Amino acid sequence: MNKVCLVFIIFMMSLSLQGEEEKNSEFAIFPQFAYSQETGFWGGLITYYRYGLNKFPDLKNHLDFMAMYTEKNQLKLRFFPKFNFPISKSEINLDATFMKWPSEFYGVNNTDPQAEMYEFTPEIFEFQLDWEYNLRSRWALHFYSDQVHSVITQRENAAIMKNVPGNESYLLSGIGAGISYDSRDSEDFTSKGLYANVKIESYCSWLGSYYDYEKVTLDLREFISINQNHVFAFQQYVSFRSGQSPFYRLFKLGEYVRAYKDELFLNKNGIAFRAEYRFFPFKGKIGKRIGFALFFDTGQGMQSVKDVNIADFRCSVGAGIRISIFTDDRFNLRFDYGRCNANSAVDISGGETF
């Protein structure tokens, strides 16, 4: 009940922030569909509500909501508003998510792509806050807060998961800080620019967290374009933890190497590199909406930093099709196929992976 009240309070607060300065608003509802190995086919809807202010017509606050249900009986509800405060040069991003998400467990530090799988169903409520203070020349400071409640309602094999951290019901409470640089020309389909983010988070018992650990992430992206229709994209991602983290919050190599399931390789730390060539070779009203991508992903999950070894990196290569819903800012439907030896995966979704 408290969780529902929290979301309701956020919604009412967001309405009150409009005040008398509201100038224009936009509202839209879109159906969604996608496919991945983790979910099978899924469908849902997403609603967008944007409203601007008289004094700052170029800035819009967001009230967005998403609901999805999958072929594997997974449910996700997400409310993610964004509020701009131009006088103080800041913005606040909130994210309240509920998930009832039947999943697969292959063990922690697994190295076998053919490892035996065990099913379990967690129910997770998470509330995140990202307060961003904009500095000069595309730099920004961030303050983060993360609150999580998780309980596993079903287990296929309770004995296997008995001693795994995060097997029981738990609360996580953490705060963090970061700095970012962003010169991208678009977030939906970037054709040029740089993005860099360094983030440090701490989950502490004095904040009410059942687990004490620290997490450091580094996300670097570069985009180089021959022209708007031919783009090379690169990403370097690093994630390290100290202390004990619930298994569901570990580094998932499959989120970055597209030939593998997300949950197949769980590790305390991880590093990944991705490269893509995205191109739209055709012209005409229909042709200009059809594009393609070639990609290469590689990375490694490891227990300790000293275990980093290029020989242990897992790789995938693949290709994809892009269909532009909007041609001005290139919001694309994405159909990707990645493969590595006997492992392969299909991913159908909206927007680019990075």
Task: Give the location of each predicted region.
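Transmembrane beta-barrel architecture of outer-membrane proteins
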Residues: 75-77, 98-100, 121-127, 147-151, ...
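Membrane-embedded beta-strand positions of outer-membrane beta-barrel proteins
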Residues: 29-33, 63-67, 92-96, 141-145, ...
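C-terminal outer-membrane beta-barrel translocator/porin domains of Gram-negative envelope proteins
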Residues: 78, 175-180, 184-290, 294
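C-terminal hydrophobic structural anchor segments
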Residues: 278-316
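Extracellular loop and loop/strand-boundary signature of outer-membrane beta-barrel proteins
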Residues: 65-66, 111-117, 160-166, 203-208, ...
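Gram-negative/organellar outer-membrane beta-barrel architecture
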Residues: 21-29, 33-171, 330-334, 338-345, ...
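Hydrophobic h-region of N-terminal signal peptides that target proteins for export
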Residues: 10-18
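Short loop/turn motifs that connect adjacent beta-strands in outer-membrane beta-barrel proteins
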Residues: 20-26, 53-60, 86-91, 138-140, ...
